[in-house]
């Protein structure tokens, strides 16, 4: 009987210990949830001040060939646009309105046609953010206005791993100069017939930027020759390295006297490829790219009825369920992952990662932005 009482007392002690552990665990979870809610509230309050319409009406333009394939990201962009007061335009290739058909109907390549259609949509807003359908805003507290420079007509950014001026996303002002820039780019699909390795509209864009900013004709001819003779990716990136060096040298010699096109440094823009950090992201990121495989979870939760409330935007997409686990990291962690990606890219593309190139500075710049 005494032994039974002892066992009973021991059992109660274990039960009390277990309850204490559960309470402690729940308390930790509640504290973390409160902290996340406070951070989200802070980001929202900051965004209310940062997203004032300083540059007029902002539009987000998506050209998607398979709307059902990108249902999740398109819905996410709609939530973001509605929360910021931006307009959203989703256009399907070869199903555009009559204005677009009249102006762009002769352009067969979707990669070039999309820039022509974007030019037609320009007159609906003051600034247009062109984005790929497989991209999405991961932090709603970031604003398009952060990246607008009113001294320029077109704003590009350099892609981190390749050194290319990115063709898949750009900011463009509603102006005759911008419209001509996009239409001229769109009309250059014929160039691909002369090139073996061209990367579609990306390769053409590198030369288009150089011509627009007024790079020396001899330098242009040198880069064109590299482009025309490229027979492999090695040759293509030698061409990209040529255009990158030419743009950097032109900036040094001429400054920014011709304020037409601005090219932001890698990670200095609004978008980066999500695979660079293995799917991880931070509060610093704005738009993540290359979400081609959109699972049922994303499609289910990222829809208009489930848009976040105004006080719960930052991190909303990833607080909905298992997708969040292990993906949001500190800026330190992301910087280490980016440094690793940079070393890998430098081995594969030495012509792009040369001394003095902007790519060699971006990881430290990303790390320095943690307080912003």
How would you label these PLM feature ranges?
Residues 135-176:
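Conserved donor-nucleotide/metal-binding helix-loop-beta segment in metal-dependent transferases, i.e.
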Residues 71-76, 93-94, 142-143, 168-170, ...:
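Short coil/turn segments at secondary-structure boundaries
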Residues 51-55, 122-123, 147-149, 161-165, ...:
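Extracellular/periplasmic catalytic domains that process cell-envelope and extracellular macromolecules
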Residues 89-90, 129-130, 154-157, 169-171, ...:
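Structural recognition of the beta-strand scaffold that forms the well-ordered cores
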Residues 118, 125-136:
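Short beta-strand-to-loop acidic/aromatic patch adjacent to the donor-nucleotide binding site
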Residues 115-116, 177-372:
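Catalytic core and acceptor-binding pocket of nucleotide-sugar-dependent glycosyltransferases
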Residues 2-125, 176, 327-372:
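N-terminal anchoring/stem segment of glycosyltransferases
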Residues 66-67, 95, 135-137, 160-162, ...:
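Solvent-exposed loop/turn segments at secondary-structure junctions
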């Amino acid at each position: 009987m005494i032994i039974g009482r002892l066992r009973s007392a021991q059992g109660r002690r274990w039960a009390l210990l277990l309850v204490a552990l559960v309470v402690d665990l729940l308390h930790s979870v509640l504290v973390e949830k409160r902290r996340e809610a406070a951070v989200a509230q802070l980001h929202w309050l900051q965004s209310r001040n940062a997203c004032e319409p300083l540059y007029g009406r902002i539009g987000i333009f998506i050209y998607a060939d398979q709307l059902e394939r990108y249902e999740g990201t398109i819905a996410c962009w709609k939530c973001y646009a509605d929360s910021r007061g931006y307009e959203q335009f989703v256009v399907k290739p070869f199903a555009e309105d009559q204005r677009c058909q009249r102006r762009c109907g002769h352009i067969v390549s979707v990669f070039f046609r999309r820039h022509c259609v974007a030019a037609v949509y320009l007159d609906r807003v003051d600034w247009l953010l062109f984005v790929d359908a497989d991209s999405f805003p991961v932090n709603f507290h970031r604003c398009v206005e952060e990246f607008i420079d009113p001294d320029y007509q077109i704003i590009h950014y350099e892609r981190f791993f390749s050194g290319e001026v990115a063709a898949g996303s750009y900011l463009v002002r509603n102006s005759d100069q911008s419209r001509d820039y996009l239409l001229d780019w769109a009309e250059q699909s014929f160039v691909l017939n002369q090139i073996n390795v061209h990367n579609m509209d990306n390769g053409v864009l590198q030369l288009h930027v150089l011509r627009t900013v007024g790079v020396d004709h001899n330098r242009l001819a040198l880069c064109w020759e590299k482009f025309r003779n490229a027979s492999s990716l090695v040759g293509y990136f030698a061409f990209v390295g040529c255009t990158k060096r030419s743009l950097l040298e032109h900036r040094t010699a001429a400054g920014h006297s011709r304020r037409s096109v601005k090219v932001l440094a890698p990670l200095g823009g609004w978008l980066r490829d999500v695979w660079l950090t293995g799917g991880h992201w931070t509060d610093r990121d704005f738009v993540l790219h290359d979400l081609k495989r959109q699972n049922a979870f994303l499609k289910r939760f990222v829809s208009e009825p489930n848009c976040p409330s105004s006080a719960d935007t930052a991190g909303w997409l990833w607080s909905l369920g298992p997708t969040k686990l292990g993906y949001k990291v500190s800026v330190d962690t992301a910087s280490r992952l980016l440094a690793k990606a940079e070393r890998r890219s430098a081995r594969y593309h030495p012509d792009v990662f040369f001394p003095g190139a902007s790519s060699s500075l971006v990881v430290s710049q990303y790390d320095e932005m943690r307080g912003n």
